[in-house]
Design a protein with these regions (language model features):
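Conserved hydrophobic positions within beta-strands
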Residues: 36, 82, 105, 119-121
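Mid-chain, well-packed structural core segment of small domains
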Residues: 92-99, 104-111, 117
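HotDog/MaoC-like acyl-thioester-processing domains
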Residues: 2-27, 109-114, 118-172
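Short histidine-centered beta-strand/loop micro-motifs
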Residues: 70-71, 93-95, 107-108, 128-131
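Hot-dog-fold acyl-thioester-processing enzymes
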Residues: 2-100, 161-172
Length: 172
């Protein structure tokens, strides 16, 4: 039996763990589902501390649990957690800029909820520069019961797939 060492698999090229899609690889109507993520008390506390959202409703669990049944999660945290699932899987290494984002909250999200999202490509638009394009998407975020808790519409600038002549060693 042959053993494999790190040197055996080493190369000069980095191997991306998550590689995003280029602008040219998307089609309007295409849909992608993220993995699921449970929102924990620690997530809420860290977000409140970083964002400065020191609202009584988020800080005092006892004051809101009677009304909602559990501690509420700010909509901004829900959105950022979904961005944290979308960006590494669809846009890693290809996303250049978030150009526009609009969120609509439909139902409350609470500590202990598990969320995921479906990303639907709604628009593909080239830019003046041939190395990039704009992707529009509608993101539907659902909880563990399948209830849509938030929808987002975004526009992002992505790079296009490099032409073979642009890749080092490719045909000229």
């Amino acid at each position: 039996m042959t053993s494999t060492t790190r040197q055996d698999v080493a190369s000069t090229e980095p191997i991306p763990l998550c590689q995003g899609r280029y602008w040219d690889e998307f089609t309007v109507g295409q849909r992608f589902r993220t993995i699921r993520r449970t929102i924990h008390e620690a997530d809420l506390c860290a977000f409140i501390g970083l964002s400065g959202m020191f609202s009584e409703g988020f800080l005092n669990g006892a004051s809101r649990q009677g009304v909602m049944g559990a501690r509420p999660v700010p909509g901004a945290l829900t959105y950022l957690m979904i961005e944290g699932l979308v960006v590494p899987t669809l846009l890693a290494g290809t996303g250049l800029a978030l150009l526009e984002s609009r969120q609509v909250m439909h139902k409350p999200v609470q500590v202990g909820d598990t969320i995921d999202a479906v990303v639907e490509i709604t628009e593909l638009r080239p830019t003046r520069r041939p190395d990039r394009g704009v992707v529009g998407s509608r993101i539907s975020i659902a909880n563990q019961h399948g209830d849509i808790v938030m929808t987002c519409e975004t526009k992002r600038m992505l790079i296009r797939r490099p032409a073979p002549s642009d890749i080092e060693g490719g045909p000229a």
